[in-house]
Each structure stands twice: as structure tokens, then as C-alpha cells.
Amino acid sequence: MNNDTEYRKNPISVNKLLNKELKIPEYQRPYKWTRKNVADLLNDIGTAIEDNRRPGYDEFRYRVGTVIIHNKKDDAGNITERNIVDGQQRLITLSLIKRALDPSFTNSLLEHEYKDKDSVGNISDNYCFILEWKSVNSGKLEDYRGAFENILEAILIEVNDVSEAFQLFDSQNTRGRELDPHDLLKAYHLREMNEYAFEKFNLVRRREEIRPYRIRELFSLYLYPIL
């Protein structure tokens, strides 16, 4: 395997991952997680904290899922961008939780300029929910802060070749919204757009008003038989 197609797959603490300079590319779908998704994640973290206290489980680590990053490089081989291919929903949510636990915390995902109104609305609503959770769980906050450093980890896959990244795209986290096949095809084409990418992205999204089951039906009838 050459240097363009090889990839690295390693566990990484969530704290360290959130501090990386990550970019949300234009082809990514909006942030769709709801309060229920956030509540499930908070409960999972709480369970992980309890498990870590059990005798013999002090080295226990809870994996929040897999994150796929495409490392975009310049001609000299230096990384210029770390684009999130998979794991955006979890990373944004974990960043919101971390911010609520530590108001001084910020990262590239929190500073990102979200242009989609659904993303803005869901981020705002979920952060309000996390603050509400924080107000009634004040006795647990120190444990949750420690979990980010010592218990929570992700599997980080770093890919140099973008085609390889999209081949790995079907490695989905069970907590996330399942992707339809047209999401991948849309993403593959949108990543080639250089100018006016966001305007083109919105044009494609308007086409997505077609019900997903109809698109899946078209894929099964016409695309899959030739693959």
C-alpha cells in the first residue's frame, strides 16, 4: 500500500481529539442530533464512569465511536486541513458537553460558522439541554470532567487519500443518524466543488426533498446491479 492510500487507526482520548484543529467540509450534512441523542450520550458517559469504579476496571475505557479524518496535504506533504468525513455529530455534541463542563473550553468545531439553520437551531437547543442537565447534576460534574481525560476515547482513522476516506465512510456509529446511500454519492461529488460550494450544497439539499425511500428504491433498481 503506498503512502497516498495507507491510513492510521488508533485509539485517542476524547480530550485530545477535541483539541485537534478539525474542519467540517461543505459536503457534510447538517447537525441533526436531538435532545434524546444528547441524553443517551450523557447516560452512556455516566455508565462508563460507574464501570470505571468497579474493582479491576480502573483501566476501563469507553469508546464513543469511530471518527474518520481526511488529512489534506500540500505538495510538500504537510497537512493543511483535517476534514471530518465521519463522526461530525458526536464530535460537535461532545464539544458542547465539554464547553458546559468547562466554560473556558473552545475548539475549531465550536468556532465554526454554521450556515445551516437546522444546525444552528439544534446546536443551540442541545446546549440549553446540556446546561439544564448540568444544573441538576452538580454533584457529578467533576466525574464527567475526569471522564473526558481518562475514560472516554474514540477510534481515530486518519486517511491521506480522500477516495480511501469515502470507502471507509460506511463505518457508522450506532448512536448517529444512519446514512442513506445517496448521502455518500452526494458527498463524493460535492467534495469536488471549489467555488460557491455552499450555494451548490444548498441546491443539492433542495433536491433532497424527495422522500429517502424513493431514492433508496432507485439505487436498488439501477445502481447496485452494476456495482
Task: Spell out what each predicted region is.
Residues 1-227:
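Covalent nucleotidyltransferase
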